[in-house]
């Protein structure tokens, strides 16, 4: 079985989309890669809907200006990714790889 935390899957998908956006650097995606990108877009859509982040977003929209601008100074209350990553790596059977095959029946990780 493969085991990984969903956060690593999200980061993988964001990186895949980033690479597709910079085709001039990474090359055009193949048909198989485009199918993978569709999967990534849907996975991130599901994450956004499931997590339903309620952080208020402030916009600047002067009168008669057709261009609404997002003010990027909003604060999120987040988990500390460095601590999540440290926790996951301490329990990994994969020596730093975020996804690996685990032998069936083998004990994985430790206490939560």
Curated annotation (Swiss-Prot):
Top-level taxon of origin: Eukaryota
A single GO BP: mycotoxin biosynthetic process
InterPro entries named among the record's database cross-references: UstYa-like
Family the entry assigns: Belongs to the ustYa family.
Name of one Pfam family that matches: UstYa
EC number per UniProt: 1.-.-.-
Position of sequence motif HXXHC 2: 36-40
Free-text disruption phenotype from the record: Impairs the production of victorin or of any victorin derivative or intermediate.
Taxonomic source organism: Bipolaris victoriae (strain FI3) (Victoria blight of oats agent)
Protein name: UstYa family oxidase VicYb
